[in-house]
Amino acid sequence: MHPGLLLVNLGSPASPRTKDVKAYLQEFLSDPSVIEMPAALWQPLLRGIILPTRSWRSATFYQDSWLPQGSPLIVYSQAICQQVQAALPDWNVRLAMTYGQPDIGATLKAMVADGCEKPIILPLFPQYTQSTHGGIHRQVEATGLPHTFIDSFYDQPTYIHLLATKVWQSYQAHHYDAVIFSYHSIPTAMVRHGDPYQRECEATTKAVLAERPELPADKVITAYQSKFGPMPWLKPYLKNELMQLVELGKRNVLVVTPSFVVDCLETLEEDYVQNYQTFRASGGDRFDLVPPMNKDTGFSQFLADLAIQKQEASNHAITSSSKS
């Protein structure tokens, strides 16, 4: 028997072709963790209006951001997995996706068949929210296999240090009028129902400021992006903040995206293209993004250390239980 670690990210279409994007969006947007609406109401809307109109448009965005090796989210997630495996040579480290391939259930079963007694599940999302973690939990639980979860790491000192260092390095490169910490938004109904996401996002911003007091707090803004559908989502929205900053004469901005640990459609298309164009069209000058963790070996080592800590805590709990 040997320890196992399953890293999980959101997923990506198999290709940027419209049919593959449509299949991916159908799986993603059919998850009740993502869309809190009765299926009898939501599915006709999804299949009849949203998928036919959104799939081809999203496909063009994926085509623009696709790397020669494949989806950026998959490519960078695989790189992280390989680096974590190198840091944990005695472990079985694998990668799965909530939607698309590799499948969570099949990967977890393969790990157990390979001798992993109780794999650790580590979603690659610093902050916990039902919309990302709910589907992971359901798929893992459906296997009936023993496991443990690391549900968030937004408050881990090493993670905050890594994030704060990236922000500070980028901030020093130019004179910025504002630094926006932009997190993926979620429906406000989830927060009302007890989802801790907003609290954890705000805590992340505050922790970075505490780690780097040289960063002017009066320039820092917390915002949210990637809203989908007509329901109210967490505000303020990044796009609106960008336009308002220009109106205030703040034309040089730095954007940080802590909820995305790797480049994906939201960073490469929504931010680098759409939000950049909005900002420039409004009269803004400099629009820069702090790079996500991507292939940062320090981040991969942090994930490896986090898994070791979890394994040691589990072993200690088992030992204590056997003695009592």
Swiss-Prot record:
<dbReference type="InterPro" id="IPR001015">
    <property type="entry name" value="Ferrochelatase"/>
</dbReference>
<dbReference type="InterPro" id="IPR033644">
    <property type="entry name" value="Ferrochelatase_C"/>
</dbReference>
<keyword id="KW-0350">Heme biosynthesis</keyword>
<dbReference type="GO" id="GO:0005737">
    <property type="term" value="C:cytoplasm"/>
</dbReference>
<keyword id="KW-0627">Porphyrin biosynthesis</keyword>
<feature type="binding site">
    <location>
        <position position="184"/>
    </location>
    <ligand>
        <name>Fe(2+)</name>
    </ligand>
</feature>
<dbReference type="GO" id="GO:0006783">
    <property type="term" value="P:heme biosynthetic process"/>
</dbReference>
<keyword id="KW-0479">Metal-binding</keyword>
<dbReference type="InterPro" id="IPR019772">
    <property type="entry name" value="Ferrochelatase_AS"/>
</dbReference>
<keyword id="KW-0963">Cytoplasm</keyword>
<keyword id="KW-0408">Iron</keyword>
<dbReference type="GO" id="GO:0004325">
    <property type="term" value="F:ferrochelatase activity"/>
</dbReference>
<dbReference type="InterPro" id="IPR033659">
    <property type="entry name" value="Ferrochelatase_N"/>
</dbReference>
<dbReference type="Pfam" id="PF00762">
    <property type="entry name" value="Ferrochelatase"/>
</dbReference>
<comment type="similarity">
    <text>Belongs to the ferrochelatase family.</text>
</comment>
<comment type="function">
    <text>Involved in coproporphyrin-dependent heme b biosynthesis. Catalyzes the insertion of ferrous iron into coproporphyrin III to form Fe-coproporphyrin III.</text>
</comment>
<dbReference type="GO" id="GO:0046872">
    <property type="term" value="F:metal ion binding"/>
</dbReference>
<feature type="binding site">
    <location>
        <position position="266"/>
    </location>
    <ligand>
        <name>Fe(2+)</name>
    </ligand>
</feature>
<keyword id="KW-0456">Lyase</keyword>
<comment type="pathway">
    <text>Porphyrin-containing compound metabolism; protoheme biosynthesis.</text>
</comment>
<protein>
    <recommendedName>
        <fullName>Coproporphyrin III ferrochelatase</fullName>
        <ecNumber>4.99.1.9</ecNumber>
    </recommendedName>
</protein>
